[in-house]
Amino acid sequence: MREEKEIIIVCLLIFIVGVVGIFLTTSFNGMKYTSIYIKDYEANLYIGKNLTLEEIYSYEVLEGRKYRMLYRDWKAPLVYNGSLNTPYVKVLNLSTSSKDMVGYVVDYKGDIFVFSDEDWIKRNIEEIVDKYYIRNEVGFYNPLYIRNPGIYTTSYKFVIYPPIETDNVFYHINLKLADEHLPYKNVKINVIDENNSILDLFVYPSTFKVYKTYFGYTIEGSSPKNDPIEVEMLLKPNSVNGFTRYVYNVEGKTISAYKKYTFVSNIVMTLKYLLMAIILLFPLIAYIIYLKFGKEKFYVVPEYLSYVPNKNRKPWIVNLIFAGDAGFFDKEGFYATLLDLHNRGYIKIMNGGKIEILKTDLENLDVYESDVMKFLMKYSKNNVFDPEYIKSLAQKYKSSKDKLKKLKDELDKIMEYPRYSSKVVNAFLETRGKKIIIALLVISILLAVFLYFIPKYSQTFNEVFYLSIVFVVQNIILALTPTSLFGRWKANYYKEKLEWDAFKNFLSNLAMIKKYSPEDISIWKDWLIYGTALGVGDKVVEAMKSLNLSELVADYVIIHSNYDSMKTSVDSVYSSTTGSGGGFGAGGGFGGGGGGAR
């Protein structure tokens, strides 16, 4: 495939990933992907001598016979009868629109109050409470499950005795109305200031709208699943009952915490839209990098070439540079080198995979070919190399990890990672564009890691983190592209690359290759050697079999079967021996919990 098509496909792919990622990230508020959510949450918070909270939850149940409990829990001690000498919430009453549901309260101790005369219902609720270790919860239970989809309403009334920070100038209360809850589609909170006690009000998340009204304040918004909802207030001293503790400079700490929250929130919101823009524009960015560092000159090369484009090019270099992704070397390069050394009279491939060493003068060989010959000579006996001997050595070295690792490294050097591969690649390719892609990948990963560890005050923080993951995925796709796509071939090597591709196409076409005469053995030998280097040696062998060129076919089959087995054996033994082992501001409020269902 020519690189023009490759870059278009890559850009289209990362664009699709970006659009889908943004859609899933920004639309996932829980309501579209759940069988129940809270359509309307309305609360009246009375700021009088006591802090009184009235709540109405309107559940929309989308799937019948799945839920049997609608509840409101607290992350604060809940009492039904009596009082505590620490901050707590007291239940005054509860009601529901459904006659089929039974109310219950589970206090902070686990004591259960069921508003039914039926003993079996009480036992059922007790079993559920024990099973889920329920505490600090008030709600309604339907023993026959909620059968029909529809709207179901529950309401509660509480008196809250919160922790209060004071410096004798201000009272500070931070009330968390929810933090782990179903999605709230519509939120409306009326803060009713009965005695004009509120001096300042701070609402979390900052995306909620706050209106000043004749009775106090109205707060409106929408809350995704588990998004915190908090109301923080500065009040006149001695205006509300609660549990006070002295804190120096209450006003300063409150305002400082809120400013910090809004500052971070604004940064995160800006980062959200910036990431969305980068994600959507990233295909264009990738294309610009390609134009700057990867776009090649146009060459006219036929689709098929029946001759070896460059016979002076060593088979292992053809495998490393032209067979696929430049810089990726595989065992076919090693096998092609063995066939080439056999053809040039340095070795003789024998039955059973053995190799007879015919020449020991390595002066005319390059570095990689010398490494191959040195390996064969080092582990040969009487100038005959036997792959079975390498297998036996691997078994022998099981108890000596250092010797086994040395053997594996020697084998890897000739079958996977030739020396000086990077220098060879740099001789053919200018890789600055690919380095930019790798740098972008590293930056995207560091950003995602940073965002993972910062506190998640609201859904927006989660969205930014998920968007960073989308950006990482886009960069991974680019990083996995061939080196040559964002690199530029030096000199006229791109033309040679196209010629090797055309030659590979020819060798892959059985009908075309079989047209050539079997008498010209030298041509078939070249085709087998370079076809192996290009990864299509099996196609050449298939044609040879049909033309009865059995001798050449035998060499290919012997090498593959015996040396595949040798490499696998060493890797397997090595793997078995190494193994593997094994307050103030947002989030600081009193209360928590929220509306749920089970």
From Swiss-Prot:
It comes from the Archaea. The keyword Transport does not apply. Disulfide bonds: none annotated. Keywords: Cell membrane, Membrane, Transmembrane, Transmembrane helix. GO terms for cellular component: plasma membrane. It is a multi-pass membrane protein. It holds the Pfam family DUF2207_C. The chain crosses the membrane at residues 7-27, 274-294, 435-455, 467-487. It is found in: Cell membrane. This is Uncharacterized protein MJ1577. It comes from Methanocaldococcus jannaschii (strain ATCC 43067 / DSM 2661 / JAL-1 / JCM 10045 / NBRC 100440).
